């Protein structure tokens, strides 16, 4: 098991298009923390996945599992504070599960994936806090359309609904393992210089006061 680090670890969770990356970026700048972003742009499978989920579901999930494991190992080894855009736990409990349940990941692939996840997760430091952002499927569709990623044009509202149901079930389960805060972004706007964003920053500063900066550990060989 990893040694107990001294830096803070905040994870931002939530459905596609809910605003995780923007919030991660803004909080990192406001708090002076390091940010780890979801590896979307570099993902070699994402475009193909949205065209043919059944063909690429397992490949995509293994890629995300690998990348997020490496990121979380780095976070666990460091003494500085980090914010992570989407957690490794969402890969397992939201995306892989939903893809399997809707028939896009076979039983054998799903079982192999979950077995690998269970092994890897045991080596990881858990977040100090998971901030779960939620929004209605209609809001998510609007935000996805607004950011205009070519690979996301085929996302359906029904897929977002399925993911949302999986998120709601997982969050109830996760409360027994992690500290969790839920923000309904339809009701509590965090985009832009809102009072809600200011209040969130102040609350995080209160809960996680600044630490004396320490150097990051050397990069792990890849």
Predicted feature locations:
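P-loop (Walker A) phosphate-binding loop of NTP-binding proteins
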Residues: 15
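NTP-dependent small-molecule kinase module
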Residues: 141-222
